[in-house]
Amino acid sequence: MKIICSKNSLLKSVSISLKAVPSKTTMPILECILIDATTNQIKFTTNDMELGIETIVEGTIEEKGMIALDAKILYEIIRRLPDNDVTIKTDDKLTAVITCEKAKFTIPGKSGEDFAYLPIIEREECLTVSQFTLKEMIRQTIFSIAANETNKLMTGELFEIKDNCLK
């Protein structure tokens, strides 16, 4: 695999994806971010078996492929790179070489096949809501969400779509 992306788009996607990386786990693959460049877009995926995040990164795919890299190490490397295009290249031994200008990092990876993929959600009903409206809906109801996870049922919000109306 070989991809080229701007540092800023990589950093943004990795920092968003880090929110679904568990701090402690018995499954080391969950500490990784899956870089999937097997289609015509570059996807970054993380999953802690409760929360999964997938982001799409703008960039160029020169060679298709997939690899799972330690998310925190990848974040620290990208954060310290100069503001320029970053190249991530992998080999058959699952080693990733990250280069940007004169900087070059080599980190071990894991097979993307071992990664816990996100479930495919079939959409029965769809509704488009503006970002502002959704933010306001959440702002007006967030006070009722439990602050701790002792009662998991109370840590989220319920959205219902009926007759093309979101409640």
Enumerate the language-model features and the residues they cover.
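Structural preference for solvent-exposed beta-strand-turn elements
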Residues: 1-167
